[in-house]
Structure formats: structure tokens, C-alpha cells
Amino acid sequence: MTKRYWNIDLEEMMKAGVHFGHGTRKWNPKMAPYISAKRKGIHIINLTRTARFLSEACDLVFDAASRGKQFLIVGTKNKAADLVAWAAIRARCHYVNKKWLGGMLTNWSTTETRLHKFRDLRTEQKTGRLRRLPKRDAAVLKRQLSHLQTYLGGIKYMTGLPDIVIIIDQHEEYTALQECITLGIPTISLIDTNCDPDLADISIPANDDAISSIRLILNKLVFAIREGRSSYIRNP
């Protein structure tokens, strides 16, 4: 994997609060190598380690995107949801930002069936067929469509398992992470000081609660994916 320069600036990360971890009582001892200090009852993340692993993650997604690989971004907590959708749309990735439905990847055949149903209902809505149904039947199908849009809207164009999954908040998305581990899908995960750095293929130590921190990390990854996609388009 070729190393590239991604303009990852320590001062920019400090301004975004990337270095603020959780309280010292809520920590995973495995995170000790990624912590530089304790301050006012919270752990301070070593930003040089953050920069190193973020750079590695950018290299990985660039190379994958330049080979036409598919990405899934997962972040369902309220603070991350809008950022995840925005980042995924910009980078033309799939995303889950409302709720992870158990078995979404490990029981892919069921997910695929739901996606087919979702696409069929969207087609019926666009062509006006729903309006021609009896009111009660139309109401039932509209509720189904709304439910599917909420939970599967970000993966509606996904035709198979993703090649790489990017996870925002390891604790919140533990089920998704476990499904990736089971299937052998490479993962990139934001990890705060209460997480296990050994679970993901690339763990980026960072504040996973602050919107500014999540935005900065996603911005770098999105830029790398977009650059990789441009390379793929130029050299198919």
C-alpha cells in the first residue's frame, strides 16, 4: 500500500477536540498506548497516534476506491447520523445512520429481499400505482415504504456485501463490527478511550462524541475516497 500525504494537522485536530477522551474511570486499559495524559478527570488522546492511523486509513480507502471497491459507513447515534449521511453521499458510499438491523450483513439474503421490496415500492410510488390502490392498501404500503426508507435508505443501491466498513463509535456499533469480523470484512473504526483497539483492522483513536471531531475524521476519509475514485475513473 503506497503511503501518501493527507494534510493531517495536529493543531487542526486539537481545535476540533479530537484529543478529548472519556473520563478516566471509563477507559479500556488496552487504550493506554494511545493516551498521552490525564487532565481534569479525562484521558487525553495522543494525536500523533491519531494522525498515524488516520493516515493509514486514508491510504487504505484511497487504494480500495482506486480499484472500484465499495464502502459502507455506519454511525447511528444522533450526533453522528447527519454527518454519516453527508459524508457517504459526498463519497458515493453506502451508509446506515438510523439503526443497525441485526443480521444486516451476516444474513445478507434477508437484507437483499428487503431491498428488493424497497425498490419495488419506490417504483410503485414514482409511477403513481400506489395512488390507484384502495386507500387502506395504499396506506399499508406507504407505511412499509417509510419504514424501509428510514432503515435501508442509505443502502438502497447496495447489491452485495461491502468491501470495507467504516464505523463511527465502536461501542454504539458493536453488532455491526461483530458482523464484519464474522464475515472477514475489513473495518476502520473510530475508537475513544473506552474502546478495544484490537477489534478493527485500523483503529483511529479519537473523540467519538464531539461533532467537530467526527466531522474532521470523516472529511479526511471522504477526501481520500474521492481521490481514489477519481483515479479509478481516469484509469479503469
Swiss-Prot record:
Keywords, sorted A to Z: Chloroplast, Plastid, Ribonucleoprotein, Ribosomal protein
GO biological process entries: translation
Record's keyword annotation contains Lipid biosynthesis: no
Family matches, as InterPro entries: Ribosomal_uS2, Ribosomal_uS2_bac/mit/plastid, Ribosomal_uS2_CS, Ribosomal_uS2_flav_dom_sf
Family that this chain belongs to: Belongs to the universal ribosomal protein uS2 family.
Record NCBIfam families: rpsB_bact
Record's protein name: Small ribosomal subunit protein uS2c
Organism (species): Daucus carota (Wild carrot)
